[in-house]
Each structure stands twice: as structure tokens, then as C-alpha cells.
């Protein structure tokens, strides 16, 4: 395990030096297996991303978008071309072509399933989640959709009704992003919180694995209200 000082210095170097993507991926792979899994490309495909035949190019667009997002997140920079894409998305809203989350959940097989309501769990973590599930011997199925607006938690949890109001709420990720007393962007610009984000997700996946092994639950459904 790396110390917090080592993690900070590693992220600081990524932020202040201009590495090629190949150099960035290589350095990350040698320093942190968790960060390496996070940076792996997650492909939006015909299985996890259902869209109409006329919108299939959206899958490649989203694949590229989130890969660029993750690289810029850990290097604490925004490229002008990426900012242009964000502004374009804000106007065109291509993500509305994805299935609504409520539609996806209403069609899931929820028999003997436990809902894990993971606040602020975004698409950016899917490559990490998928790899960790495989490591823990868990069979994972991913479905990507869009949430309704406003995306704040209070107004954006209609999916709970499909589980009879019973669920396990995981707030740590959202608390880390918005209310942390340790990671303060006003004081430290480097995204050192990424390591704790991945720890929180990993801890929950291991908890789910334990519950499945103990047969406390037979199926886990992870749903998020919002996230990058």
C-alpha cells in the first residue's frame, strides 16, 4: 500500500507535468492497481447501452468522452476541445437518447434481489467496478441510462418504489465529494480524493460479495441517482 504522501506526490506529478497518454497509463499501472483499473477504457456497447439504430454512434461518442474525462480528472485539467464537447452536449443533450433509468429498473428481474442505492456513483467508475467484480468472482450485468432532472438526490430516487421502499443506502461517495473535512478543493487542487473514492466502491463490492457468499442475499442491484 502507498502512503497518503506518496499518493499526493504521484497525483501532483500527473498534474504539473505533460505526459503522453501512453506514459500516463504506464506510470499509473506501476503505481496503483486501483487507479489502473479506473483508467481502463469502458466500452459502451449494444449490450450495456440500448439506443435506437439511428443513434448507435452515441456509444462510441460516450466511450471516448468518459475516457477523456477520466484522464483529465486525475491530471486536474480540461482541454479546450473537451470543454467544447461539454458545451455541445449541454445544448444537444444526446444522453437523453439513452433509456430512462426508471424504464431499465422496471424491467429488471428483482425477485430475491437487494437494492444498493449508491449516491453519486457515476459511469466513470464502471471499468473499475467491472474489473473488481471479476476479481471477486461476481457475475456483473451493466445497464446504462439517464436520470431525470433535477438530478439532486431528494428529487431523483423514483427507482426505490420498484423495491417496495427497501434498500441499502451508501452515502460515503457523495459525502466525500460534497462535505469532506479532509479533501478540500479550495485548499488542495490536486484530485487526491480519487484513491478514497475507489476504496469506498471497493469496500462496498467486497461487502456485497460477503453477503452473497453467506446467502444473506441472492442478488445485488446497484443503482445510482447521479454522477459523472
Identify the function of each model-found stretch.
Residues 1-114, 120-220, 224-228:
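…; additionally, a secondary subgroup of soluble metalloenzymes is captured
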Amino acid at each position: 500500500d502507498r502512503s497518503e504522501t506518496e499518493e499526493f506526490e504521484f497525483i501532483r506529478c500527473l498534474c504539473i507535468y505533460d505526459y503522453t497518454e501512453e506514459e500516463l497509463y504506464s506510470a499509473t499501472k506501476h503505481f496503483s492497481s486501483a487507479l489502473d483499473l479506473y483508467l481502463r477504457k469502458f466500452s459502451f456497447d449494444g449490450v450495456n447501452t440500448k439506443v435506437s439504430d439511428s443513434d448507435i454512434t452515441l456509444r462510441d461518442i460516450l466511450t471516448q468522452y468518459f475516457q477523456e474525462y477520466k484522464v483529465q480528472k486525475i491530471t486536474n485539467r480540461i482541454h479546450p476541445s473537451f470543454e467544447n464537447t461539454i458545451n455541445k452536449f449541454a445544448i444537444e443533450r444526446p444522453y437523453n437518447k439513452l433509456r430512462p433509468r426508471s424504464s431499465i429498473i422496471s424491467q429488471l428481474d428483482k425477485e430475491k434481489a437487494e437494492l444498493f442505492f449508491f449516491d453519486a456513483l457515476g459511469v466513470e467508475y464502471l471499468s473499475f467496478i467491472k474489473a473488481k467484480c471479476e476479481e471477486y468472482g461476481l457475475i456483473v450485468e451493466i445497464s446504462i441510462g439517464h436520470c431525470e432532472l433535477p438530478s439532486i438526490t431528494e428529487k431523483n430516487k423514483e427507482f426505490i418504489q420498484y423495491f417496495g421502499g427497501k434498500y441499502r443506502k451508501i452515502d460515503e461517495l457523495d459525502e466525500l465529494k460534497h462535505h469532506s473535512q479532509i479533501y478540500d478543493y479550495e485548499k488542495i487542487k490536486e484530485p487526491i480524493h480519487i484513491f478514497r473514492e475507489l476504496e469506498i466502491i471497493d469496500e462496498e463490492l467486497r461487502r456485497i460479495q460477503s453477503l452473497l457468499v453467506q446467502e444473506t442475499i441472492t442478488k445485488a442491484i446497484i443503482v445510482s441517482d447521479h454522477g459523472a
